[in-house]
């Protein structure tokens, strides 16, 4: 029987298909950057034509790329569609790139999803990395520090952050008690969202923040729409056709960003109209004053849109990471009650029940600090930094990386590297304590990657660590968290810019004592 009976193509069709394939192959080969003599491109696994490695990445790119790094090394290359992406793993390699060669890797790729955030003017997501961007970053960092971790002369609290967190933590305890008196159980996530958003809102807008706004709470409770789309490897950034096909996730992302930007514009405008220009009480007021100084006597209008963009970045730096960290912490505490008891014993011994915890107590509460660090490491809920890009042709560990190459930083791999941690799958806060168990092992704690490194390091890192500590200290001093017997907690993370655990509606809180 003739072979042609089993082949559904004619010889002409086969010849034409082969010719087209060869042409496409040579075109793509010609598009590859020429590697300077003596260097080489990063190793790359086999990939599908047109699709690249998108199928290999699957629903958990951090796990897939960690597995690839075990075979191909700390510097490897993948393709998402036709776009080359360099993936960095290994703590030393990432430090080399982002710190020692920070100027080479400080860029951001010009991705479609980034253009939808603050109309493409976000300091965190914008591809700009020049002097103007650096000045904006310094301004945002200084404003955030001034009205968060700097001392507050008008308050008995050590700083603005301590004042706001103490207030909202007590309010949170009150809400949880009401829920226990009613349904007798609760989903902690929405309650945490409300508390954290009020803290960052107070620091950004002071008395002008509409903390009871239904729109604000609705936005924050739906922030998962943002983190699910503004993440490393979003197909819409690499396959342009997906922007024009029916795409409900993309439409929700667009709508969320438009709603949030509109809310910020309205709040900033109201703040500008009503605030006392001679009395700066919050971050937005400080930004207004800075812009007035820059405009001088020229009479130029205050660039409110730039202020909105900066406030958007500051708000983001002080909200989602903190909310996610506290939520993960509570899930670990209810699944590991023995750890919760150790923390509460430390709190009872160091602070007692005569006063509330303060930020100045951090050095005397090493086990609580170790628990927070282990939560950061084990959950690795920020699996990748926001993607970087190279600002010029460069080399890393002997591999050539061309200018404007997209770069993924695999923080999850570092936090689960057996060479660093020995038993990375185990949740063990004691790993971060010294041999005597009375202090933190600071060199080891600095090996956790969660906030990035170098010139793009998160401006809210210090704020985040301090806020998580104080919220947990106040909550655990007064409350004991648990779930009823038989309730299973699902700690499997859902991939995103920040990874969330499955929601649990069966958490309970027992009052240990009250200051009332």
UniProtKB/Swiss-Prot annotation:
Compartments reported by the entry = Endoplasmic reticulum membrane; Microsome membrane
Q: Which Pfam families match?
A: p450
Give me the reactions it catalyses.
an organic molecule + reduced [NADPH--hemoprotein reductase] + O2 = an alcohol + oxidized [NADPH--hemoprotein reductase] + H2O + H(+); 17beta-estradiol + reduced [NADPH--hemoprotein reductase] + O2 = 2-hydroxy-17beta-estradiol + oxidized [NADPH--hemoprotein reductase] + H2O + H(+); 17beta-estradiol + reduced [NADPH--hemoprotein reductase] + O2 = 4-hydroxy-17beta-estradiol + oxidized [NADPH--hemoprotein reductase] + H2O + H(+); estrone + reduced [NADPH--hemoprotein reductase] + O2 = 2-hydroxyestrone + oxidized [NADPH--hemoprotein reductase] + H2O + H(+)
EC number(s) from the headed UniProt entry: 1.14.14.1, 4.2.1.152
Q: Where does heme bind?
A: 458
**InterPro entries, sorted:** Cyt_P450 (IPR001128), Cyt_P450_CS (IPR017972), Cyt_P450_E_grp-I (IPR002401), Cyt_P450_E_grp-I_CYP1 (IPR008066), Cyt_P450_sf (IPR036396)
* Pathway(s) the chain acts in: Cofactor metabolism; retinol metabolism; Steroid metabolism; cholesterol metabolism; Lipid metabolism; arachidonate metabolism
Q: According to the record, which residues are glycosylated?
A: 69
Which positions are annotated as binding substrate? 226
Q: How does it sit in the membrane?
A: Peripheral membrane protein
Q: Which UniProt keywords apply?
A: Endoplasmic reticulum, Fatty acid metabolism, Glycoprotein, Heme, Iron, Lipid metabolism, Lyase, Membrane, Metal-binding, Microsome, Monooxygenase, Oxidoreductase, Steroid metabolism, Sterol metabolism
Q: Name one GO cellular component term.
A: endoplasmic reticulum membrane
Give me any GO biological process, just one: progesterone metabolic process
The reply on keyword Ribonucleoprotein is no
Recorded GO MF terms: estrogen 16-alpha-hydroxylase activity; estrogen 2-hydroxylase activity; heme binding; hydroperoxy icosatetraenoate dehydratase activity; iron ion binding; steroid 17-alpha-monooxygenase activity
Q: Which domain of life is it from?
A: Eukaryota
Role noted for this protein:
A cytochrome P450 monooxygenase involved in the metabolism of various endogenous substrates, including fatty acids, steroid hormones and vitamins. Mechanistically, uses molecular oxygen inserting one oxygen atom into a substrate, and reducing the second into a water molecule, with two electrons provided by NADPH via cytochrome P450 reductase (NADPH--hemoprotein reductase). Catalyzes the hydroxylation of carbon-hydrogen bonds. Exhibits high catalytic activity for the formation of hydroxyestrogens from estrone (E1) and 17beta-estradiol (E2), namely 2-hydroxy E1 and E2.
Assembly, per entry: Interacts with PGRMC1; the interaction requires PGRMC1 homodimerization.
Task: Give the family per the record.
Answer: Belongs to the cytochrome P450 family.
Please state what the protein is called: Cytochrome P450 1A2
Which species is this record about? Callithrix jacchus
């Amino acid at each position: 029987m003739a072979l042609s009976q089993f082949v559904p193509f004619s010889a002409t069709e086969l010849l034409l298909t082969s010719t087209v394939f060869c042409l496409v192959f040579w075109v793509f080969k010609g598009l590859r950057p020429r590697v300077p003599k003596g260097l080489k491109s990063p190793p790359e696994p086999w990939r599908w034509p047109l699709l690249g490695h998108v199928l290999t990445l699957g629903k958990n790119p951090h796990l897939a790329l960690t597995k690839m790094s075990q075979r191909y090394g700390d510097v490897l290359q993948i393709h998402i569609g036709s776009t080359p992406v360099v993936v960095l793993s290994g703590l030393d390699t990432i430090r080399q790139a982002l710190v020692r060669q920070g100027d080479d890797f400080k860029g951001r790729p010009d991705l479609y999803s980034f253009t939808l955030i603050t109309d493409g003017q976000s300091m965190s997501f914008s591809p700009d990395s020049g002097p103007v961007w650096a000045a904006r970053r310094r301004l945002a960092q200084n404003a955030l520090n001034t009205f968060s971790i700097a001392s507050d002369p008008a308050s008995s609290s050590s700083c603005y952050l301590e004042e706001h967190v103490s207030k909202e933590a007590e309010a949170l305890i009150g809400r949880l008690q009401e829920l226990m008196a009613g349904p007798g159980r609760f989903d902690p996530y929405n309650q945490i969202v409300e508390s954290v958003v009020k803290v960052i809102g107070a620091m950004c807008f002071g008395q002008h923040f509409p903390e009871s706004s239904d729109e604000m709470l609705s936005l924050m409770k739906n922030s998962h729409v943002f983190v699910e789309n503004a993440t490393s490897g979003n197909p819409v950034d690499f396959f342009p056709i997906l922007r024009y096909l029916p795409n409900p996730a993309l439409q929700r992302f667009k709508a969320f960003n438009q709603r949030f930007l509109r809310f910020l514009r309205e709040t900033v405008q109201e703040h500008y109209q009503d605030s006392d220009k001679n009395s700066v009480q919050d971050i937005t007021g400080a930004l207004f004053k800075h812009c007035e100084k820059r405009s001088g006597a020229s009479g130029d209008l205050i660039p409110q849109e730039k202020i909105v963009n900066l406030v958007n970045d500051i708000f983001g730096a002080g909200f989602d990471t903190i909310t996610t960290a506290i939520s993960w912490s509570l899930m670990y505490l209810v699944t590991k009650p023995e750890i919760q008891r150790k923390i509460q014993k430390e709190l009872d011994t160091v602070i007692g029940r005569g006063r509330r915890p303060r930020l100045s107590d951090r050095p005397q509460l090493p086990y609580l600090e170790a628990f927070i660090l282990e939560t950061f490491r084990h959950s690795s809920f920020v699996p990748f930094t926001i993607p970087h890009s190279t600002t010029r042709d460069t080399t890393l560990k002997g591999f050539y990386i061309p200018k404007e190459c997209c770069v993924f930083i695999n923080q999850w791999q570092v936090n689960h590297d057996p060479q660093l941690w020995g038993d990375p799958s185990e949740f063990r806060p004691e790993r971060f304590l010294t041999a005597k168990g009375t202090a933190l092992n600071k060199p080891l704690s600095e090996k956790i990657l969660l906030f990035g490194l170098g010139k793009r390091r998160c401006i809210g890192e210090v704020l985040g660590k301090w806020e998580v500590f104080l919220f947990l200290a106040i909550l655990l001093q007064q409350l004991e968290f648990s779930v009823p017997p038989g309730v299973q907690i699902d700690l499997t993370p859902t991939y995103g810019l920040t990874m969330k655990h499955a929601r649990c509606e069966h958490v309970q809180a027992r009052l240990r004592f009250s200051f009332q």
